[in-house]
Amino acid sequence: MIDWITSQGHAIFGGAWTPLWILIRAVLIVVPLLLCVAYLILWERKLIGWMHVRLGPNRVGPLGLLQPIADVLKLLLKEVMTPTHVSKGMYLIAPLMVLMPAVAIWAVIPFQAEVVMADVNAGLLYVMAISSVGVYGVILAGWASNSKYAFLGGMRAAAQMVSYEIAMGFALVTVLMVSGSLNLSAIVNSQNTGYFANMGINVLSWNWIPLLPMFGVYFISGVAETNRHPFDVVEGESEIVAGHMIEYSGMAFALFFLAEYINMIIISTITALLFLGGWAPPFSSFVTNAIPGFFWLLIKVFLLLSVFIWIRASFPRYRYDQIMRLGWKVFIPLTVGWLIIVAIWIKSPWNIWH
């Protein structure tokens, strides 16, 4: 289908088709992503409401389904107030510096076989590099606001994100070792081969079983990376109000939240691709194989996002020193140890990957 569209595009538009096709693919990623964020926020409010034995939003539209539209309109109509004491240029560019890396990562994310904007061989390296850039926007927001609360929140965010990126990096290196590729599509395909996959039990051939500690560390570190509860000391309401976002309002404030929810979707998608078989069904059969792979990936991402929300509803916020201790004294030693174990496992006669 995609090859046919490409050939027809070249025939109709000639040399102008290549940049036009890039633009079309970017729009096809960004627009659904914005809709997903809007309804992820609604799902979060609904799910937490059910966990609290209440209804959640149910007034705007049938079953509250138009609530995200109302929220967007409210934010668009709010005035963006710029305090006089801020460093205006850096203050205004900080939300964009947080949002842009979150959107840029989607260029290499495959949605199913051969459905990806840029199928680069170093896709995993690209993800690691781009995901670490967002912290600069957070630091800049804290510093440019010229507020001690914002600056303290920015410093907390920087330390937390850098600390947990190390553990996430080791987890990704382990996936690289067992799959033998930095290409995200190749990593997914490598999980759907082997003894159990040949029997049709794909779920037992995915990386989540042999790399279970890495699976847990990566996902929990992802929760910390996105500054979500219980790792949200960056915006601890009882201590520093909204942290680095305290001087922002209106749509500028909304951009930080947009980046946060996009990062949640990114962490869930990458976790599904690296550890849960990507777009492969859990069991191979005539019925499951007839369902497009994109829907299987969507189901896995939805379940992981629901875990994000469940964690928020269930756990108290950690103290800052507890978060740092977990990252440096538990996760990093655990990932290094499992990395060594997997390296020995690969070289042993019991190698299950190659």
Curated annotation (Swiss-Prot):
Membrane-crossing segments per the record: 22-42, 91-111, 124-144, 168-188, 203-223, 255-275, 291-311, 326-346
GO biological process, one term: aerobic respiration
Keyword terms, alphabetized: Cell inner membrane, Cell membrane, Membrane, NAD, Quinone, Translocase, Transmembrane, Transmembrane helix, Ubiquinone
EC number: 7.1.1.-
GO cellular component, one term: plasma membrane
UniProt xrefs under PROSITE patterns: COMPLEX1_ND1_2
Quaternary structure (record): NDH-1 is composed of 14 different subunits. Subunits NuoA, H, J, K, L, M, N constitute the membrane sector of the complex.
Sequence similarity: Belongs to the complex I subunit 1 family.
HAMAP family per UniProt: NDH1_NuoH
Protein name as it appears in the record: NADH-quinone oxidoreductase subunit H
